[in-house]
A protein has these predicted regions:
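Active-site periphery "cap/insert" segments of enzyme catalytic domains
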Residues: 2-6, 38-182
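An N-terminal structural lobe/cap that precedes and organizes the functional/catalytic core
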Residues: 1-49
Length: 182
């Protein structure tokens, strides 16, 4: 248990142990996914699912395909996707496309993560060998079962990850039924 107020600053990549992409892996996925190339009207390169999202969201897709080429060609110049989108902030279609790609690839990675159980449940045991299990163990250390609701009263988490792994894991791991508190 943390007896004094404690702040944890969680950097990007902290969910990599759970199958989520690091910042550089996310940049690589976005780069490959947005590098749309067509041959005879058929998509030959790029992410088909992302292209379908574009077609469903925007009435004029061509400016976004062009934006995808520009972002794809420059993204490796920047240390993060955030920096790339900041660079392109005056180009709304590039920023919108970049944000859409981030959401697309993070949601896909969350669905494929070992933590993703059946029917929207969370496979808590999949995190047994990760820092998340160690973290919750530290928070519960020294507490009695009836005090589990106080485990995080002195903890603040500042999370720089796009994914929801930390929140999902902690929420699921601390459910009353898991601790026979109902």
């Amino acid at each position: 248990m943390f007896n004094k107020p404690t702040v944890f600053i969680v950097g990007a990549g902290a969910s990599a142990e759970c199958g989520l992409p690091t910042g550089s892996q996310l940049k690589d996925r976005i780069r490959g996914g947005l590098g749309f190339q067509f041959e005879g009207g058929q998509l030959r390169k790029g992410d088909e699912a992302l292209l379908q999202l574009l077609r469903g969201r925007f009435s004029q897709v061509n400016p976004y395909i062009k934006a995808g080429h520009e972002l794809s060609a420059t993204i490796t110049t920047f240390p993060s996707i955030d920096e790339a989108l900041h660079w392109w902030r005056a180009r709304l279609e590039i920023v919108e496309l970049g944000k859409l790609a981030i959401a697309h690839y993070i949601l896909d990675a969350e669905r494929r993560s070992p933590l993703a159980g059946k029917q929207r449940s969370v496979n808590i045991e999949a995190a047994n060998d990760t820092w998340l299990a160690t973290f919750i163990s530290m928070a519960l250390s020294g507490l009695e079962q009836r005090a589990v609701s106080r485990a995080f009263e002195n903890i603040t988490i500042i999370n720089f990850n796009y994914d929801r792994t930390i929140e999902t894991y902690l929420y699921s791991a601390l459910q009353p039924a898991r601790w026979n508190l109902e």
